[in-house]
């Protein structure tokens, strides 16, 4: 895929192993973990923008919530949003790399299926607003087999919430009502 991307105009690439053929006038950066490096680069890029950023997570309703928030914000602000439901370690950086100087707000959807993933995406996103739609059974088998495990994983969204940030929780969700905010 590297040579295809480079031949279509990419200036360079991050790679865990050097390709057999190096194309002229392209750059190659060797990294141990390409996914980690992509996320670190996206986080660095996001920090160049002093705009409100909403990070949305939850067991269900993430995409609908993201679309509604972006539609409302878009009435008054030039708002970037996650495309479709590209809410993983590849899609989140791709969204952040679409930030431009004219953007005034962003709504970033983040999904997960293991502990640590929402915190990692929050490290990239650096949210000023954190939204948890609900806590359900999605991926429960990877999260201690309990909804409390799912709650703990979703609560990772607060790890990188701005100190003066806002948490928005679904008041109808019984587990979200057990959280004591500010969350530490």
Question: Predicted regions: what is each one?
Answer:
Residues 36-171, 175-183:
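Phosphate-binding loop of NTP-binding sites
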